[in-house]
Amino acid sequence: MLLFVLNAIFVGQSIANDVADMVKRADEYRLDSSSSKVVSKVTLFEHDQIDKTREYHVYTRPNRESLVVFKSAVEAGQKMLMLGDNYWLVMPKSRRPIRITPMQKLLGEASIGDISTLTWSDDYQATMVGTESIITQEKLSVDTHKLNLIATTKGASYQRIDLWVDVIKGFPIKADLYLRSGKLAKQAQFTQGEREGRLQVVAMTLIDKIQPAKKTIIEYQSIMPITLEDKYYSPAYLTRNSKLDL
């Protein structure tokens, strides 16, 4: 009996490790370096016509820390800082940073959390749901593992995520993103492409399930390993130095 129990525990732990590895592998297709500069272009479409476009430079580093620099003329001088579960918006003429949440919208369906957070493994605990054959954006049928991700941090953008990853490659295909209320907030679809000869997520399409005529596409135009000095991750420093060339 004891041997049976120990074997069951071992098998359960092995499955949990496998699922955690799947999430980390999916993360690597989105961000393959712990400290990086990500140039993101966000485009809002309505009835397949471009409505608005914005550009952001995102500086990420370990321990769930990100600095987002707003680069478009209409948002010039604005910055957003994420330090773990805490988020601040820094306005160019403000004397103090403004506390915000990761769900605050930037453009269309793209929220602060969608731009600043490029990994799942630091914020979620995953379990295996099963396998499904689904149709990709490219109209191809792909066998996937369906994973259920539950938030483990207060600053996670979504309480729950249903994530589908390619059985063979581990590439993320799509995700259903749920609010703390249990409501489906939006669906994300991931576009495959190559960056420096490697398969990567080159764009994420966010679809509003309530307003299907609208969609928001976040393009990851470039990702390069860069480490900023610690001072840039201080809300007080960002407030005092509104004109940073980043």
Where are these regions (language model features)?
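Mid-chain, structured segments of secreted extracytoplasmic proteins
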Residues: 60-102
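N-terminal, post-signal-peptide region of Sec/Tat-exported proteins
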Residues: 39-67, 71-75
